[in-house]
């Protein structure tokens, strides 16, 4: 609860500020972040495309020109949704419903949905933990592609080799506290803390 979170030099959270933010301020701050859950959390009643466009459609209703230009605005959002889904390899699944998809495909929809709002930071909460090993690769491939495009991401993961390959910085948590922080090379090859060494030895012995 202490410290600050800054995005593009703007303070979006300050633990020392006791002021209660308004709902509008909270919503505005949340737009800096996109969140991809480990359990997908897609809307089962909507198609893949609708899952991706829904949030932006709801936000568009707040635009002063929405009533006047409704069709054009919604068409633009639909086109954007189609492009984002194509970028994660799901252009053939836009009219499907979540239950018709594999777990890996559902997670790629969740990634596309988060990308629709063009967040400054994309946050992943164990994005592969609910997937079979065979499906993990397709999700990691999408995340690796985002890293290649210099997308800023915070990834909670137990995929150690992937974290080592794709990260600029690695943060190792132990019992909710930061145990070690550094470059992938430093943390994985030359850990400073005994706890980090113990964890890595046990992991790579498996």
Where are these regions (language model features)?
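Helix N-cap at the start of a conserved alpha-helix in ABC-type nucleotide-binding domains
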Residues: 133-135
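H-loop/switch region of ABC-family ATPase nucleotide-binding domains
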Residues: 157-158
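Catalytic Walker B motif of ABC-type/P-loop ATPase nucleotide-binding domains
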Residues: 122-125
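ABC ATPase "signature
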Residues: 181-182
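A short, surface-exposed alpha-helical micro-motif characterized by mixed small hydrophobic
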Residues: 163-165
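Conserved signature/switch motifs of ABC ATPase nucleotide-binding domains
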Residues: 96-99, 117, 149
């Amino acid at each position: 609860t202490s410290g600050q979170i800054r995005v593009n030099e703007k303070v979006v959270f300050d633990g020392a500020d006791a002021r209660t933010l308004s709902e509008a301020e909270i919503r505005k701050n949340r737009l800096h972040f996109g969140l991809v859950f480990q359990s997908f959390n897609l809307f089962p009643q909507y198609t893949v495309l609708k899952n991706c466009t829904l949030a932006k459609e709801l936000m568009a209703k707040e635009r002063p020109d929405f009533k006047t230009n409704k069709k054009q605005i919604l068409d633009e959002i639909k086109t954007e949704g189609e492009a984002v889904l194509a970028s994660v390899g799901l252009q053939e699944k836009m009219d499907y419903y979540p239950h018709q998809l594999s777990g890996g495909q559902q997670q790629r929809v969740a990634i596309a949905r988060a990308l629709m709002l063009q967040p400054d930071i994309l946050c992943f909460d164990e994005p592969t933990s609910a997937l079979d090993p065979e499906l993990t690769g397709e999700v990691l491939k999408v995340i690796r592609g985002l890293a290649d495009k210099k997308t800023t991401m915070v990834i909670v993961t137990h995929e150690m080799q992937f974290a080592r390959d794709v990260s600029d910085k690695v943060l190792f948590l132990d019992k909710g506290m930061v145990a070690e922080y550094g470059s992938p090379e430093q943390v994985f090859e030359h850990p400073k803390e005994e706890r980090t060494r113990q964890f890595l030895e046990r992991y790579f012995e498996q």
